[in-house]
UniProtKB/Swiss-Prot annotation:
It is an enzyme of class 2 (transferase). The gene is serC. Its main location: cytoplasm. One of its GO terms (cellular component) is cytoplasm. Catalyzes the reversible conversion of 3-phosphohydroxypyruvate to phosphoserine and of 3-hydroxy-2-oxo-4-phosphonooxybutanoate to phosphohydroxythreonine. Binds 1 pyridoxal phosphate per subunit. It comes from Paracidovorax citrulli (strain AAC00-1) (Acidovorax citrulli). GO terms for molecular function: O-phospho-L-serine:2-oxoglutarate aminotransferase activity; pyridoxal phosphate binding. This is Phosphoserine aminotransferase. Belongs to the class-V pyridoxal-phosphate-dependent aminotransferase family. SerC subfamily. It is found in: Cytoplasm. Pyridoxal 5'-phosphate binds at W101, T152, D176, Q199, N241, T242. The modification N6-(pyridoxal phosphate)lysine is found at K200.
């Protein structure tokens, strides 16, 4: 079966091998007589799924032993509230605002933190650039600094995480890596907490990944619900309440798929990074040489995962989308807040899918000349 290429920003494409394995195990997981959705989360069958998923993720992302991996619920949007509920007790919260998602983070932090300070913003550029870390106005003794390391809507990415200590701050760095998790390595020496919804690169909607340094546990505000208290969740191995069992299972299969990936001598996340660089380069290079399409983001800030682009003649938008659907190129419409088109090139998108998109874009440009 030749499946269409799904460029959705999330929920997004899941590797076909993962879907096929899940389908084969739907009625009977490993001879248990049960599907995973039917299992008790405290039964030995699901415990083995959970433990393997956690171990595989720790290996893939090279998560240090002094970090805890939590499988939670609520998505990245809920984490924008859960983070300040856990970390904002001491002092000011610093925020770097680079697009729609960090704007949402700012709004939520202001509900719970006693003081929120915008250390830097790219709003004046229309969210087409990244503020130079050397220019950030960092607060003394901040509880944490939050940034969205990949802005899904505006297509902006920090390819290198800032070193806050080198900038004179002892604040832990909190990153929302929802839309680039597992697409590239993470420098954990620069991170205190990372969170992300699973529905872009890890599996289905409903699962949220949190990776948090142990010294950041136990600082929740009194008003923080127990189910959102990172210390409580960690002490209960992500099972203080019933976890999203199906999401953890599919994520676990995705982790195993990632471990099998190879690019030359590279494997796992390193292989995926090289593959993702190649996919993004192919599409950006075509857009940049075109007289018909445009990407507005500064080259050094461009996301590898989410590539917005615009037709110079926007009256052709609907025709472009209709032709794409006819060719099996799905969900290319841009976010309603910015318009245009958006191609999301998550891990499950093969290079062949990007090649098919570029071929169609070239054909459409020629027909529209």
């Amino acid at each position: 079966m030749n499946r269409p290429y799904n460029f959705s920003a999330g929920p997004a494409a899941i590797p076909a091998e993962v879907l096929q394995q899940a389908a084969s195990e739907m009625l009977d997981w490993h001879g248990s007589g049960m599907g995973v959705m039917e299992m008790s989360h405290r039964g030995k069958e699901f415990i083995s799924i959970y433990e393997q998923a956690e171990a595989d993720l720790r290996e893939l992302l090279a998560v240090p032993q002094d970090f805890r991996i939590l499988f939670m619920q609520g998505g990245g949007l809920a984490e924008n509230a859960i983070v300040p509920l856990n970390l904002s007790r001491a002092a000011t919260v610093d925020m770097v605002v680079t697009g729609s998602w960090s704007q949402k983070s700012l709004k939520e932090a202001r509900k719970y933190a006693s003081e929120v300070h915008v250390a830097a913003s790219a709003e004046d550029s229309g969210f087409t650039t990244l503020p130079d870390p050397a220019s950030w106005q960092l607060s003394r003794g901040a509880s944490y600094l939050h940034l969205c390391s990949n802005e899904t809507i505006h297509g902006i990415e920090f390819h290198e995480l800032p070193d806050l200590r080198a900038l004179g701050s002892d604040a832990p760095l909190v990153i929302d890596f929802s839309s680039h998790v597992a697409s590239r390595p993470v420098d954990w020496s620069r991170v205190g907490l990372a969170f992300g919804g699973a529905q872009k690169n890890l599996g289905p909607a409903g699962l949220t990944l949190v990776v948090v340094r142990e010294d950041l546990l136990g600082h929740a505000l009194p008003a923080c619900p127990s189910a959102f208290d990172y210390k409580v969740v960690a002490e209960n191995q992500s099972m203080f309440n019933t976890p999203p069992t199906w999401g953890i299972y599919i994520a676990g299969l995705t982790f195993q798929w990632l471990k099998r990936q190879r690019e030359g001598d590279l494997s796992g996340i390193a292989a995926m990074e090289q593959r993702n660089i190649a996919k993004a380069r192919l599409l950006y290079n075509f857009i940049d040489q075109s007289q018909f399409y445009v990407n507005k983001v500064s080259p050094n800030a461009r996301s590898r995962m989410n590539i917005p682009f615009f037709l110079r003649d926007e009256t052709r938008n609907e025709a472009f989308l209709a032709g794409a659907r006819e060719r099996g190129l799905l969900q290319l419409k841009g976010h309603k807040s910015v318009g245009g088109m958006r191609a999301s090139l998550y891990n499950a998108m093969p290079l062949a899918g990007v090649e098919a998109l570029v071929a169609y874009m070239q054909e459409f440009e020629q027909r529209s000349a």
